[in-house]
Design a protein with these regions (language model features):
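Surface-exposed extracellular loop regions of Gram-negative outer-membrane beta-barrel proteins
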Residues: 1-14
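Beta-sheet repeat architectures centered on beta-propellers
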Residues: 16-31, 37-182
């Protein structure tokens, strides 16, 4: 807050720590975590570089020209921040890197990190378990036919659910039928 006439202002608090893509940042418990072009960072009042034991593995093969595809998510069930990203030879997000922010890093000076390869699902969005009992995510399907989300959870039970938002049908009833909302 800077007062009249501008009310609010911006103050630069870090350098060489910019965001790699608009969806590559997440906030949990007042701390922001993000993936930059050259490392992982957090902000809790000051910018911190996150020591990362897998940083070379991630950044030696990431396609930084596809930064807008990178997305971040939180898994509160395991105190994890997850980033999905494309590798140099991939068209879509084919890998992920996970940071466990809840573990005591005194015994792990490089932090608690692990990586994985997306073999069955190319993640593009994620919502934490604060809304539902478990996290929900979507996957990208590059086939040339239309695709619809497979919903895991209370009502989806792994079934493909068809939403026709263009014509107003967006309610799926427990018996599988749809109701047009007007």
């Amino acid at each position: 807050f800077v007062g009249a006439p501008f009310t609010f202002g911006f103050e630069q608090v870090g350098t060489n720590c910019g965001l790699i893509g608009k969806n590559a940042a997440i906030e949990i418990d007042g701390v922001a975590y993000w993936m930059g072009n050259n490392g992982f960072f957090s902000f809790d009042g000051t910018v911190n570089t996150l020591p990362c034991s897998v940083e070379d593995y991630v950044y030696d093969d990431i396609d930084t020209t596809k930064g807008q595809q990178i997305c971040a998510g939180i898994n509160n069930l395991f105190t994890e921040v997850i980033w999905w990203y494309p590798t140099a030879n991939a068209t879509f997000n084919d890998r992920y890197v996970v940071y466990n922010y809840g573990q005591d890093n005194a015994n792990l000076p490089m932090g608690n990190w692990y990586t994985g390869v997306n073999t069955n699902s190319i993640r593009t969005t994620w919502i934490d378990s604060l809304v539902y009992p478990k996290p929900y995510a979507t996957a990208f399907n590059s086939s040339n036919t239309g695709t619809f989300p497979v919903i895991q959870g209370e009502t989806g039970l792994g079934q493909t659910v068809f939403f026709e938002h263009e014509i107003g049908t967006d309610q799926i009833n427990p018996d599988g039928s749809t109701t047009a909302l007007t």
